[in-house]
Amino acid sequence: MFPWGLSCLSVLGAAGTALLCAGLLLSLAQHLWTLRWMLSRDRASTLPLPKGSMGWPFFGETLHWLVQGSRFHSSRRERYGTVFKTHLLGRPVIRVSGAENVRTILLGEHRLVRSQWPQSAHILLGSHTLLGAVGEPHRRRRKVLARVFSRAALERYVPRLQGALRHEVRSWCAAGGPVSVYDASKALTFRMAARILLGLRLDEAQCATLARTFEQLVENLFSLPLDVPFSGLRKGIRARDQLHRHLEGAISEKLHEDKAAEPGDALDLIIHSARELGHEPSMQELKESAVELLFAAFFTTASASTSLVLLLLQHPAAIAKIREELVAQGLGRACGCAPGAAGGSEGPPPDCGCEPDLSLAALGRLRYVDCVVKEVLRLLPPVSGGYRTALRTFELDGYQIPKGWSVMYSIRDTHETAAVYRSPPEGFDPERFGAAREDSRGASSRFHYIPFGGGARSCLGQELAQAVLQLLAVELVRTARWELATPAFPAMQTVPIVHPVDGLRLFFHPLTPSVAGNGLCL
């Protein structure tokens, strides 16, 4: 018995020694890893690196970030301040929030920082896109795309967008069961982008097939840049090539159309604008531009649309105020055509043919609707931030940002900490954007509200996105009422795009026109 006891003690002692050695090695490795990044500071600058942790060797804090989501950034902001360092996805990162700090980053494009996209995104989207362009090519392409989102172009888009949104809301009411709003919004935004922006002639089956192919491309956009069988990049390349093959036929038709004809959609405008600048766009350029437009409109607009539906459901007082404003503007009456019978097997009813009653001018008069849309984008911005790479070492808030390091500016954190609004930033308060509080915001509020970024890379399609959300709000409020199909509101996932974890499952019910004809009743 005694020898057996000694044997057990020996095993335990050996195990303890092994664990102690492993712990010491891990501690030493972490210390050396931290030292390695401390020594990477620019010694020509007397400023220190920002506070923060570089995590574990090679992995950095990536695992913490993936598990904690938005809490990862907020906890470190509380601990280290509005500028801190970390290590994510294999790169050293400086996380930045706060209006003044973000202003420095956004206005420093081409001078202090440049846009940063993963290599896989460059491979899949191509070399002729605005996202990957820098310097003069970026300015030239931005000038061409600016016409796609000009006021004249938006005037042409709005009636067709309203028709698509009206049809969609009526189909939700006719569904006869719960609707996954996020999934439905993704399908809707793809259809609108493909048919209205790009002018593609697609039936429902073709649109659904192309949407699935496009979603496969987007899902693999941020993958390891390894083109090997079964890799994410290989799947993305296959999806991209399928999209390009489909687009090629439609683009060929446009290239051979009458050059003097008035452009009718975004692809027409891109072709005409390039020709006016003395450049004949190639087929490859146009295919990549078309995919980029789809990418820009897809997830972000679907995310914002879902957030709009969610926040209105949580705040019925806002619905009542929107309804009052619509009645005051003579827009309270919805399309009087009854949607298809609930639960019918025929699917969504055909378009009723009612004339669109909204224009950019009419939307401009809906001040409270505009405030609601802005508040949705402030509280739940679709994208949490943007990435840049430091072109040279520069100062930010008393710290050095070393050349070559990644810089991530945070949209969400900046909105959450903005002090220019009278009401608490965590609450839903559309009135914060009303005229009554305009003086309290002042000119300094420009970089406190940045759902579309800012500077040289601000979103060109922001007015179109806001118009889509305004149109959706109007059609929802005067057409339907909606309620949860689940016991409680879903949690929100924030990485990579803000969306409810369950897709937001809701029941939609049609409203009936009031007898008076100037309002709506249940």
Curated annotation (Swiss-Prot):
Task: Name the coenzymes or cofactors required.
Answer: heme
Q: Which residues bind heme?
A: C459
SUPFAM superfamilies to which the protein is assigned, alphabetical: Cytochrome P450
Segments passing through the bilayer? 9-29
**EC code:** 1.14.14.1
InterPro entries (UniProt xref): Cyt_P450, Cyt_P450_CS, Cyt_P450_E_grp-IV, Cyt_P450_sf
User: What Gene3D superfamilies would the database entry show?
Assistant: Cytochrome P450 (1.10.630.10)
- GO MF annotations in UniProt: heme binding; iron ion binding; monooxygenase activity; oxidoreductase activity, acting on paired donors, with incorporation or reduction of molecular oxygen, reduced flavin or flavoprotein as one donor, and incorporation of one atom of oxygen; retinoic acid 4-hydroxylase activity; retinoic acid binding
Swiss-Prot/TrEMBL keywords: Disease variant, Ectodermal dysplasia, Heme, Iron, Lipid metabolism, Membrane, Metal-binding, Monooxygenase, Oxidoreductase, Transmembrane, Transmembrane helix
List the membrane topology term(s): Single-pass membrane protein
Recorded catalytic activity of this chain's protein: an organic molecule + reduced [NADPH--hemoprotein reductase] + O2 = an alcohol + oxidized [NADPH--hemoprotein reductase] + H2O + H(+); all-trans-retinoate + reduced [NADPH--hemoprotein reductase] + O2 = all-trans-4-hydroxyretinoate + oxidized [NADPH--hemoprotein reductase] + H2O + H(+); all-trans-4-hydroxyretinoate + reduced [NADPH--hemoprotein reductase] + O2 = all-trans-4-oxoretinoate + oxidized [NADPH--hemoprotein reductase] + 2 H2O + H(+); 9-cis-retinoate + reduced [NADPH--hemoprotein reductase] + O2 = 9-cis-4-hydroxyretinoate + oxidized [NADPH--hemoprotein reductase] + H2O + H(+)
Summed up, the tissue specificity of this protein is:
Detected in most tissues at very low level.
One GO BP annotation of this record: anterior/posterior pattern specification
Can you name a GO cellular component term? endoplasmic reticulum membrane
Q: Kindly list the places in or outside the cell where this protein is found, as annotated in its UniProt entry.
A: Membrane
Report the main location listed first in the record. Answer: membrane
Upregulation details from the record are: By retinoic acid.
Q: Which Pfam families match?
A: p450
Provide the family line.
Answer: Belongs to the cytochrome P450 family.
Role: A cytochrome P450 monooxygenase involved in the metabolism of retinoates (RAs), the active metabolites of vitamin A, and critical signaling molecules in animals. RAs exist as at least four different isomers: all-trans-RA (atRA), 9-cis-RA, 13-cis-RA, and 9,13-dicis-RA, where atRA is considered to be the biologically active isomer, although 9-cis-RA and 13-cis-RA also have activity.
| Disease implicated | Focal facial dermal dysplasia 4: A form of focal facial dermal dysplasia, a group of developmental defects characterized by bitemporal or preauricular skin lesions resembling aplasia cutis congenita. Skin defects occur at the sites of facial fusion during embryogenesis, with temporal lesions situated at the junction between the frontonasal and maxillary facial prominences, and preauricular lesions at the meeting point of the maxillary and mandibular prominences.
Q: What is this protein called?
A: Cytochrome P450 26C1
Q: What is the lineage of its organism?
A: Eukaryota, Metazoa, Chordata, Craniata, Vertebrata
